[in-house]
Curated annotation (Swiss-Prot):
Role, per record: More likely to influence phosphoinositide metabolism than actin assembly.
Keywords: Actin-binding
Keyword tRNA-binding on entry: no
Taxonomic lineage from the root: Viruses, Varidnaviria, Bamfordvirae, Nucleocytoviricota, Pokkesviricetes
Organism annotation: Camelpox virus (strain CMS)
Protein name in UniProt: Profilin
GO molecular function terms noted in the UniProt entry: actin binding
Family: Belongs to the profilin family.
């Protein structure tokens, strides 16, 4: 069993990131771990289902706020990530990476590059996927 809270703690210690959450997408589609009182802590099942079922989604709601899809390879077994931008000012990069049981949401600060957010989120997802979760 993966300790999701340790991943969130690791991310929250880094000054490059504004928000992070881990959401189950197989069964309950609820938030498993998140930074409290932030946007991703408000993610609900109705926002998760379109992310995993609709490949052509352009402006998904995440935490009751609109985002704009930059690239979508979330359901691809080799890439398993989606890049987004916030649809409100200040514009921040967001990456969603898929493990076998959960989605890892990571939002960078407006000054953080998309590549940093992508690399960090994918690294966490790759480590979790290696354990079989």
């Amino acid at each position: 069993m993966v300790e999701w809270h340790k991943i969130i703690e690791d991310i929250s210690k880094n000054n490059k990131f504004e928000d992070a959450a881990i959401v189950d997408y197989k069964t309950t589609k609820n938030v498993l771990a998140a930074i409290p009182n932030r946007t991703f802590a408000k993610i609900n099942p109705g926002e998760v289902i379109p992310l995993i079922t609709n490949h052509n989604i352009l402006k998904p709601l995440i935490g009751q706020k609109f985002c704009i899809v930059y690239t979508n390879s979330l359901m691809d077994e080799n890439t398993y990530a989606m890049e987004l931008l916030t649809g409100y000012a200040p514009v921040s990069p967001i990456v969603i990476a898929r493990t076998h049981t959960a989605l890892i949401f990571l939002m960078g600060k407006p000054t953080t590059s998309r590549r940093d957010v992508y690399r960090t989120c994918r690294d966490h997802a790759t480590r979790v996927r290696a354990t079989g979760n």
